[in-house]
Amino acid sequence: QINGSYKLEKSDNFDAFLKELGLNFVTRNLAKSATPTVEVSVNGDSYTIKTASTLKNTEISFKL
């Protein structure tokens, strides 16, 4: 099963990626400091993915 909580350990070349997107220095540093946690839960054919960080929280639910 994929149920569980996952925490970002590292993101190689993330600064270069953000710079290529055109983000300024301050915004890039804020984004780099975020360490999101993703919680995945499955109930039958329903899936929920919750992402939480200091910058933004999101939740996506869907059925397969």
From Swiss-Prot:
Pfam families: Lipocalin. It comes from the Eukaryota. Keywords: Allergen, Cytoplasm, Lipid-binding, Transport. Gene3D superfamilies: 2.40.128.20. It is found in: Cytoplasm. GO terms for molecular function: lipid binding. InterPro entries: Calycin, Fatty_acid-bd, ILBP, Lipocln_cytosolic_FA-bd_dom. The keyword Cytoplasm applies. GO terms for cellular component: cytoplasm. Transmembrane segments: none annotated. Forms a beta-barrel structure that accommodates hydrophobic ligands in its interior. FABPs are thought to play a role in the intracellular transport of long-chain fatty acids and their acyl-CoA esters. Belongs to the calycin superfamily. Fatty-acid binding protein (FABP) family. This is Fatty acid-binding protein. It comes from Acarus siro. The lineage of its organism: Eukaryota, Metazoa, Ecdysozoa, Arthropoda, Chelicerata.
